[in-house]
Amino acid sequence: PNGRLIAYVSTGVLWVIPVTPGGDPLGPPRRLTNELADDPTWAGDSESIVYLTTDRLRRVWLTDGRIEDIPVALWWQRSTPTGRVVVHAGALFDGVSESLHRNIDIVIDGNRIVRVDPHDEALHVGEIVDATDGVVSPGLIEMHTHGDLASGEQLGRTWLSYGITSIRIPAGDPYDVVEARESIGSGRRIGPRIFGTGGTIDGSRIYYSGASSLASSAQVGLEMERAAALRYDLVKTYVRLPDAVQRRVITEAHALGMPVTSHELYPAVANGADGVEHVSGTSRRGYSTKVTALNRSYQDVVQLLAQSGMTITPTVGISGGYALVTVDDPSLFDDPRVTTFSPSAPQAVRLRGDLETSRRLVQDMASTLRRVVEAGGVVVMGTDSPINPQGLSLITEMEALVRYGGMSTIDAMRATTSISAAAMGYGREFGSVRPGMLADLVVFGANPLENIRAARDVRTVVKNGRVFQLDQLLQGPSR
C-alpha cells in the first residue's frame, strides 16, 4: 500500500521486492516464508502480509519476519440420515453381475444397505421406494469433471438428476473442492460424493492457470504437504512437468497413499503412475503417445494399459463423441434436465468436419477402449465436463463407447459403477449393491444392459440413504 514493496509468490513461497514508484526493482528480493503461500494480502499499514498456507491463515510481519496464526472458527459435522428405506426393485443390476436379479428388496438403515433379498412384503417397513417397473443400479460415477463448484446449489442437483452419486475432480481449486465436499457432507447442500485434488502439478511454465508451478523438484515436498493437509484423493501431474520430476511426485504421493494420474502414458507407466486421462489430450512431448492424428491407437498402447493395470479415463466426448451422439439423436435436448440445467447445450454442438469424417474419427477412438477392456485393462468413465454439459456428457460418453466403439453394455455399466469405485480405492464402500455398502442407487425406467440409452431414463436417485425423485431435483429448493 505504501508503494515501496511488491509481494508475490514464486517457487510456492512468499517474497517481497523493493521497487520504485514506477515498479522497477530497487534491490534483491527477500524470502518471507519456507511454507506454501497463497492469496497474499497486504495489511493497510504495509507492516504485514496475510496469506493462506495449506489449511491455515497466517500473518508475516515484515519488521522481524515473525509469523503468527490467525484463528478461524471453521468447523462442520457430517450429516448421516436415520431411519429405514426399502427399495423394491423389479430388477437389479448389482454393479458386477452380467444378468439382472429379479424382484428384489434393498433394505437401507441410515446410509448403509443392510439387506439385498428376494422380495418379502414383511420387509416393507419405513419409507418405501416402488421401483417394481424399473431397474435399480448402483449410483453412477463421473471420473473426470472440473469447475463450477462455487456456482451454487444447482450443480449438485444436476449431477443427481442424471443418477450420478459420486464425482472425481482431477484438477480444481483445492479450497473449492474442500468447501463443496464439506457442504454436501454436512447436508447444507445436496449433491454427489466429491473426490478431488488441487491444481495440477506442472512445470516452471504452467499450461493452465491455477496449476502449481514447480521450478525444481525441491518444491515437490511442499506440494505434498498441501495434499496431505487438505486430504487429496489423488494427485494430477501436468504436461509441462519434466518426466524426472513426475517420477518424484509419484514416489512421494504413493508414500501418502495417494494415486497419481496425468495425460502421459509413457514413461509414466514405467514410473508407477496409476492412471491416464484422455485417449487424446495434450502432452508434454508436443504429440500424443496414445493416439495418432487420425484417432487410431497402436497395439502397444493397449498392451501398456492392460498389462500395467493403469486406469484410463476416455473422455471420447470432447473428441467428437458427444457431438456425434447428439447429432444422431437430437431428442436428447428435449430432456427436461437439459432445458432446466443446460438450456444452451443445443447451440454448442460442433462436429469435427463432415458427418462421416466425424463418425469415423469417433469410431476409431472409441474402439480403443473396447480393445483395452478385451485385453484386461481398466477403463473408467469420465468426460472432462463442463466442456460438455455436466451429467448429460456422462450419459453420452457411455453411449458413444457402446454405439461407436463396440463396447458391451455390461462393460460400460461396470466402468461407470463398480470399476470406477474400485479405481478410487472405494470398491468396498460403493459402486455395487450388496449388504454393507453405502446406499447410493439410481432407478432407471428401462434396462441399460439391453440398451445403454436406458441410462437416460432416471426416475429416482438414492444418495447416502436419502431419496430424491427427479421432479424434486428439477424444481430445486423451496423458497
Sequence positions of predicted segments:
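Multi-bladed beta-propeller domains
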Residues: 1, 10, 16-39, 62-79, ...
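Histidine-rich, glycine-flanked metal-binding segment
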Residues: 98-137
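Residue-level detector of Asp-centered blade-edge/turn motifs that repeat once per structural unit
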Residues: 1-2, 44-45
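Active-site neighborhoods of metal-dependent hydrolases
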Residues: 223-241, 282, 287-405, 478-479
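Divalent metal-coordination and catalytic microenvironments
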Residues: 57, 90, 106, 111, ...
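Divalent-metal coordination cores built from histidine and acidic residues
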Residues: 131-143, 147, 151-262, 266-281, ...
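Hydrophobic beta-strand positions that form the internal "hydrophobic ladder"
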Residues: 3-6, 49
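Acidic, glycine-enriched loop/beta-strand segments at the rims
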Residues: 93-105, 118, 389-392, 407-413, ...
